[in-house]
Amino acid sequence: MSRLIVLSNRVKMPDNNPMAGGLAVALSELLKESSGIWMGWNGQIAESDNTADSAVLDNGYKDNSNEFTTYTKSTSVLSSVGCPASTLEITYITTALTPKQYEHYYCGFANNVLWPLLHEQTDLIRQAPEDYDSYQSVNRLFAQQLKQFIQPDDVIWVHDYHFLSVAYYCRQLGITNRIGFFLHIPFAPLKFWQQLDRSPELIKHLSHYDVIGTQTQHDKANCLTVMQHYLKPSSVTQHGSAHCLTVDIGSSRPHRLTVDAYPIGVNVAKIQQLVSQLSLECEPNTHKNTHIKAAAQNIIAVDRIDYSKGLLERFSAYSVFLQQYPNYQNQLKLFQIACPSRLDLSVYQRLYDNVRQSVHDINQQFLGTDEISESVKLGSVDLEAINETAPSIEGLSTAAFKRRWQAISYCENVLSHETLMKAFWHSDIGWVNSLKDGMNLVAKEYIAAQNPANPGVLLLSRYAGAAEQMQAAVIIDPQQPDSIVQGLNTALSMPLQERKERHQALLNGLKQDNLQSWQQDFLEDLYQVV
């Protein structure tokens, strides 16, 4: 029987913390159906670059640097011979990275070169001479591991920018299986690829996949332009929505490569189930039956601390809004959940410091003189003090406003998926301010978690991939403060009937292009490859 093999940079092991939902849960369910294999980095860094040195992994296995550990998780009953039923188990194959691989492959080429390039921030590219070689070495490493256990009918699904070259090395090793690639982040226009001297080789490597998927039609168009520029395909044909390129990859026959957009979705039914009891549990709220939301309103924003997410632009525009509409002071609250990320990279550490300073400065700006705390007077960023006055994320109802008002409540804690969905339910506005984003599932989860009788409003950046599908949101340009201010005012004053109509239109789209259809559409095209 054909098995599905998923390769992603990080693997969520079943014996660690529960999977928070989204892609991890979806891939788990998909892999169970075919006794599939999930392969990738376990998140650990080996103690040294010497492959003779070993490290003990979380699951209790002893692993050498770049020696792969196999772990099988079964949820089935035992068969008559005492073996788990094969259709209900997943095999996890993971490895640690060596310190040099972490520095040059992960921090270096993947996140200091490809990430800024694909997000059209080439001014932020930082590259050491060893970075590209390490990137290729790690891609080759995973291809070699695939070679060890691949079976003739297996299908390989590779995820994201960390592995542009894996298919190339698989073909070099004689692997002829179907291999698909899905890019979760944007595909940059040609002019950005032309600024990287390694682009011709990377695109040549990318052409060894059978199916390449992007998040949006815009990204697909960029991908096709880049492919045609570097590969000079002998033909380009269209079959339905997909484009097929015939390219020379040095094999015995021309290679056919399919490129299409497969917008990732969310599990709407599961999210709605998580919040279904809230309408019965929540305390009475006087504005629930009015046509206009009450003055005391909650805005929620959830982001990794990344320069692509537009956090500083959000805070700046929010400050302008409160100045232009002072009646919202002491009423409107922005709850920012911001997860620190990649702090080993200097650009991220600077951004992290700037985000916290900006939160502090805005809260100081809108405090009365008699309310200024010692930490404010000292001009320091006291994160603990900021969080002390933040409302409980599960209490984003009117009760939260009984506490002293501050403009921004800031949280760096990792929240469970259930807690986050409940927070969305309680919020009046969900704010996505991305400067560039492949999709942004927060936007989709926010809509899925809303109370249809009194839905909140989605404030959505035009530069998020989700905007291509979610035009019923209030679309803003995060690079234009006036656009954000106007969008906030529109969202805060929107009548109930309009909120309902917009929410229903957005929800219908989510149900049509959901997480399951994303998987099915991509894999259907991949399985059709001959």
Region roles according to the model:
Residues M1-V530:
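Catalytic cores of carbohydrate-active enzymes across secretory and cytosolic contexts
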